Amino acid sequence: MTKPQINLQDAFLNQVRKENIPVTIFLVNGFQLKGMVRGFDNFTVILESEGKQLMVYKHAISTVSPLKPVSTSFSEAKAPEKS
């Protein structure tokens, strides 16, 4: 039986999007973008910042830092313990 793949990136981004948690996105060139994640796909993140929408390519992102802890629960993806 195969284990389900946990996609931490999607779970994290989806949680900050759903809970409207402000984030700071650090880019590889040192820039910082602050705002709310409004959407994402395999290659981009849509960030709303100061009333504008920004499409940020994921390959340019080094870190996404939420303003408060993100409550991601991966308990359903854990393998059952054997007794």
From Swiss-Prot:
GO biological process, alphabetically ordered: regulation of DNA-templated transcription; regulation of RNA stability; regulation of translation, ncRNA-mediated
Gene Ontology CC terms: cytosol
CDD domains for this protein: Hfq
GO MF annotation list: RNA binding
Keywords from the named record: RNA-binding, Stress response
NCBIfam families: Hfq, PRK00395.1
Subunit structure, as described in the record: Homohexamer.
Protein name according to UniProt: RNA-binding protein Hfq
Species lineage: Bacteria, Bacillati, Bacillota, Clostridia, Eubacteriales
